[in-house]
A protein has these predicted regions:
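Juxtamembrane inter-helical linkers in multi-pass membrane proteins
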Residues: 1-3, 104-115, 274-288
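C-terminal amphipathic alpha-helical interaction region
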Residues: 287-297
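Membrane-interface helix termini and inter-helical loops of multi-pass transporters
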Residues: 66-70, 150-155
């Protein structure tokens, strides 16, 4: 029980440290690259604070079926897991609204005309739109994982693996790729080798991730375990997994080709003789005026201290739980 407790509590929180940089790029780089502004600076700040507070103590939703965890702690972590959906929805709303502002400024008309007016040739804009789609699918799976009742159907199955690959390998990593395409030319002083090839790489990653993770969810629903020492491969249920696993192999190959394309574009960019037109990193500004924040609230040291105190408190809480 101790190993599973520490594993679920620590490693689930760690994935949010990978997600945070992707969110930062969505708020600070994407609106400017799209030609607009951040729809709400305050909403972004609230989303980050909520995500920080609720993302740390929620790992026990992987242990709903574990007999070593008390029901009260499971309920607490279930509540925290559902609360993570709030900053996620705030982020999705703010980013999409920021893109709509950019689309309207570029001449987009009608209810959805702003989507077509966006600069789809810009890797940052394209990646943000694809990331939002994968975050939508992955977020839906996360709500099922959070539910104490529905979790019983997917507990310790490949559904869980498909879910976090769609969020991390999809939403997070595709934003990392786009940021690399944005920052690498500014760091090297060389113009991006091929915007078209960069966009093709992003599309391939999006397609490959869906081809990989959707069958992963399916075989999870049909009962393929996430961790098991042995499997009776002669049963008819196990034989039904073959087609989905073959499709997943195709998805993995697509992702591999996409990753090679990323390396190729960055390598050719490094050797490009054409200098980058604008070497400065441009950050997005808020659409609405931002009220002055107390100096303490903008202090990096203050928030580091808050996180340390918070994590120590959570450690003491889990220690007392294990002792009881």
């Amino acid at each position: 029980g101790l190993a599973r407790t520490l594993f679920s509590w620590t490693l689930h929180a760690i994935v949010y440290f990978w997600l945070f940089p992707a969110y930062i790029a969505l708020y600070t780089l994407v609106p400017k690259a799209a030609g607009g502004r951040v729809f709400s600076d305050q909403m972004g700040r609230v989303a980050f604070i909520m995500l920080l507070v609720f993302s740390v103590p929620i790992g026990f939703h992987h242990l709903y079926m574990d007999p070593f965890q008390a029901a009260g702690w499971k309920f607490l972590h279930m509540t925290g897991t559902f609360m993570v959906a709030v900053p996620t929805l705030l982020t999705g709303f703010t980013v999409i609204a920021s893109l709509e502002v950019a689309g309207r400024l570029r001449g987009g008309k009608g209810l959805f005309g702003w989507i077509g007016a966006l600069d789809w040739k810009n890797p940052l804009v394209l990646a943000a739109l694809l990331a939002m789609l994968m975050l939508t699918f992955g977020g839906f799976g996360g709500m099922i994982n959070a539910s104490y009742a529905m979790n019983t159907m997917v507990h310790n199955t490949q559904w869980v693996t498909g879910h976090f690959h769609l969020i991390f390998g999809g939403t997070t990593v595709i934003m990392y790729f786009a940021v690399a395409y944005y920052l690498w030319p500014k760091m090297t002083g060389k113009e991006l080798f091929s915007t078209g090839l960069a966009n093709a790489q992003l599309w391939l990653w999006f397609i490959g991730m869906l081809v990989l993770t959707l069958p992963w969810h399916l075989i999870g629903i049909t009962g393929q375990p996430r961790r098991i020492s042995s499997t009776p491969y002669d049963e008819s249920l196990v034989q039904q997994w073959g087609t989905s696993e073959l499709i997943m192999v195709v998805g993995g190959l697509i992702l591999f080709i996409s990753a090679l394309m990323l390396v190729y574009v960055l390598f050719r960019t490094h050797g490009n003789s054409q200098a980058v037109a604008n070497p400065e990193v441009e950050y997005a500004e808020s659409l609405h005026s931002t009220p002055r924040m107390p100096h303490l609230m903008n202090s990096y040291g203050f928030w580091v201290a808050m996180v340390v105190v918070y994590m120590i408190a959570r450690s003491e809480e889990h220690t007392s739980e294990l002792q009881s």
